[in-house]
């Protein structure tokens, strides 16, 4: 294991000096672009995105930065991915199917846009000589365990959606590549991530609905679904903290705020974000404990491991959601794709 425990060089700000960001035009990816290019010691950032969920406007502020290269291509184009990865030490892998509920009618989507993508990333990393992969997994890998607060070594892991299954398969693939090919992978099981440029999620959906019709809001499920919501800046801080401090060939971290909020409470926050009187809004619930097949209605995550490295969220769930929805409400493209 000659290289697996060796970190790539970091800047004085703790960032990788170069990175290929797969999904870099998306919600989280574009914030990574902002963060890395704000660091003068970062020498190169390459964005790789097929724009299925991302948008070029997310990174347009950096169009004149010569350190940035943008590749519009599909991750399944392995030769292009290998070419783009070559010369980088770090890959930030964020690409996946953005529509979790879509698998109910298209069960193959999470294999094609999840498991297969991560296999392509693993191969590109192996062939190109990249040393570190930072992988966006998800809390769904734990399955439906109700109020039990999951730590990273919880088991057995029994996903209840193909999306979560693809994330777990991705962790397994990257772990095996780390040990077999002297790589280093850090996987992150995020709570629900929110913030400006969000392209999906309950807050995004509520804001779009209320902008279209401020008198009515359709809510999936019974509104009692309860989860942790993490602001995107806190996600970036967690990933970069773990990248700087974790030395294992494969490591995994939950990232959550430690508090929880229900969908019904989010509906009220959406009205607050838009300065709408909730008494004038008709809330229509679809019923049932789950928003869709494969949804996990209650998610509890322990984030003690990432906190032990010095990370703390700057916002709790309600503040993260309110700030995110206020930002989304001012974005001209919120009401369109």
Question: Where is each model-derived feature located?
Answer:
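Hydrophobic alpha-helix immediately C-terminal to the catalytic Tyr-X-X-X-Lys motif of short-chain
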Residues: 169, 173, 177, 206, ...
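Generic structural signal for alpha-helix termini and adjacent loop/cap motifs
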Residues: 31, 39, 57, 106, ...
């Amino acid at each position: 294991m000659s290289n697996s425990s060796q970190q790539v060089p970091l800047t004085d700000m703790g960032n990788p000096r170069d990175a290929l960001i797969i999904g870099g035009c998306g919600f989280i990816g574009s914030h990574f672009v902002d963060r890395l290019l704000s660091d003068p010691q970062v020498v190169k950032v390459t964005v790789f995105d097929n724009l299925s969920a991302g948008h070029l406007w997310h990174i347009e502020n950096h169009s004149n930065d010569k350190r940035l290269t943008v590749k519009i291509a599909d991750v399944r184009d392995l030769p292009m991915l290998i070419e783009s990865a070559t010369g980088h030490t770090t890959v930030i892998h964020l690409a996946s199917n953005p529509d979790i509920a879509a698998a109910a009618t298209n069960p193959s989507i999470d294999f094609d846009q999840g498991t297969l993508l991560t296999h392509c990333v693993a191969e590109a990393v192996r062939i190109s000589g990249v040393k570190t992969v930072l992988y966006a997994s998800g809390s769904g890998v734990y399955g439906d365990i109700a109020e039990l607060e999951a730590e990273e070594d919880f088991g057995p892991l029994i996903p209840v959606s193909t999306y979560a299954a693809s994330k777990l398969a991705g962790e397994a693939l990257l772990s095996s590549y780390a040990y077999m090919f002297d790589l280093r992978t850090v996987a992150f099981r995020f709570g629900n991530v929110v913030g400006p440029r969000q392209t999906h999620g309950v807050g995004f959906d509520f804001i779009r609905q209320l902008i279209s019709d401020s008198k009515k809001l359709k809510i999936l499920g019974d509104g009692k679904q309860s989860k942790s919501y993490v602001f995107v800046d806190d996600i970036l801080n967690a990933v970069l903290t773990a990248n700087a401090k974790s030395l294992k060939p494969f490591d995994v971290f939950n990232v959550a705020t430690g508090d929880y909020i229900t969908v019904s409470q989010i509906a009220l926050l959406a009205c607050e974000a838009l300065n709408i009187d909730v008494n004038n809004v008709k809330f229509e619930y679809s019923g049932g404990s789950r928003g869709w097949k494969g949804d996990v209605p209650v998610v509890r995550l322990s984030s003690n491991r990432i906190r032990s490295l010095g990370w703390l969220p700057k916002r709790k769930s309600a503040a993260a959601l309110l700030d995110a929805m206020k930002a989304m409400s001012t974005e001209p493209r919120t009401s369109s794709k």
